[in-house]
Amino acid sequence: MSFKEITPQQAWEMMQQGAILVDIRDNMRFAYSHPKGAFHLTNQSFLQFEELADFDSPIIVSCYHGVSSRNVATFLVEQGYENVFSMIGGFDGWCRAELPIDTAY
């Protein structure tokens, strides 16, 4: 089993149906702005994530530009998560698509 790649628009539509979007960017960038409703997935927050997500929950991984999210998506599949997606373009693509964001400013 592997992950699938989806566009930011597809990710947003899936989130409206209950998918979990995890943002793996660094603390400072996540705090400044991130996709609306995103969970900040870090080594420190992984246990909290495990409590939040079922193994069959749709999980979308977002990073800066859509590259490192593939590695985390692969890791999640290896951990037993069955419905994993990597978001093409990452947060940069999300912003270009003019999708909702939460910001600190």
Swiss-Prot record:
Top-tier EC class: transferase
Span of domain Rhodanese: 15-103
GO biological process: glycerol metabolic process
E.C. code: 2.8.1.1
Subcellular location: Cytoplasm
HAMAP family: Thiosulf_sulfurtr
Protein name per the record: Thiosulfate sulfurtransferase GlpE
Species the sequence originates in: Haemophilus influenzae (strain PittEE)
Gene transcribed to yield this protein: glpE
